[in-house]
């Protein structure tokens, strides 16, 4: 169940990132304030979706959901809860997801805090940031998915 939720949230965040890039290019061409305000809302949704995705992975580590390959390889039932939580980002897949969280939060904070800069500067910066975010999201989804599941899993974990 957590693998489906995590994968759905990853796909949803990819959709939001595409939408932000598309709206940013449209805003550059049309110079429309309504489109620019919608970018704020979609950027907030993008950040929230990635955060929920990460906390889904944290939850999988906390309850020792060994149907996820990532949890199976990096956790054990006897580990203290602190080590289970830190095991979320202590591996390749989790650290990439944490990196995407940092990128999306800084992208959203850039939109909020830099209102005194020219609009074209903000939009161009947002386009570059979201192209990077999109690249990381595709890499996570297709190459280093923390929500990859296995059908036969042990009861105690590897680590």
What are these regions (language model features)?
Residues 1-159:
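Polytopic transmembrane helical bundles with strong interfacial aromatic enrichment
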